[in-house]
């Protein structure tokens, strides 16, 4: 297919499925916590707007959760079908970690999800709030175990190799590996930020159409209030995560920075834009700021960072991909910080809900959190190549022995099925968002009437 061998097709297929999948858990994590906050505020204040927003977003959450489960199962199966070498080599560590995720997180979510979605007016208010909170907690626990597994693949420790397979020797070291705390914090906050932007864009759409209801205004205000706190925090977390990556994966940082050579002994500049050239081993058309790279990554005005030429050619990541994916992520992050701070200025002027250009900007920023997450994951995953377990197992050694034709057909099937199934899911979510929170009362009235009629029948 397009002149690609089975190895590259397997990588493309996994990249496609995992990119599809990560969108849903990111929104699920943020919306679950948002729903718990909304229900808690409603119990405390009895403000009907919080109740409207809870019912409005719970429908979207349910669809999102379902698509996340389905896409996650498909992705997990690929470890056995396309990456059997990895499963055979590292399954004694990644297998238990994924099992812990199912036992501690998925069972918790599944157990309380039914009460959360269908228990309104059927169980007590406090019990329902407890169920919502447990679902939110389950999403966080799920994030914990998934990122523990991924982080171990990035910075492996607590193991030994026996007969060509990884054997765990210290589970605490495996779970709390060097990059895990930074990766967990970075991804969790990214999920909250993405959800806040998604919610804010939905509110902006209704405000632009003249819907000035208090529920819509509350939705817009809450999303921007969360963004004011989390967007700058994410920048700080990203900075310390970068320092950790420099310590444990210096080749990745060199590729991100497009930095090739330290032979001149000068401090490393920060290349804002350019075109990394893997063949010529340089970054063409570089627009750079002298010394700033060393200052950011070394906190020094003289000490350079490692260069790509310090590593063998076969162990260098694809610099053009990670160079640009990182800059997309950072650029969107800066726009998020601008959006949050400017919202404070508009709030002070009492024009937050009336500034049409800002409402349009907020609508435009709706998918930016998810795009930034995808760019970030491209950076971290492509940046660790050619390793699947960093420094231990190469990606080419992890792939299953499939033919080119098999992988081509498999990839085409995934493209078609995902486009159809998840296309309908996206359509339903957009349809629900367009209805708005004020339509919930009418829907609930219809549901109550149908329940009464069915009960009489």
Annotate the PLM regions.
Residues 1-457:
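Polytopic transmembrane helical bundles with strong interfacial aromatic enrichment
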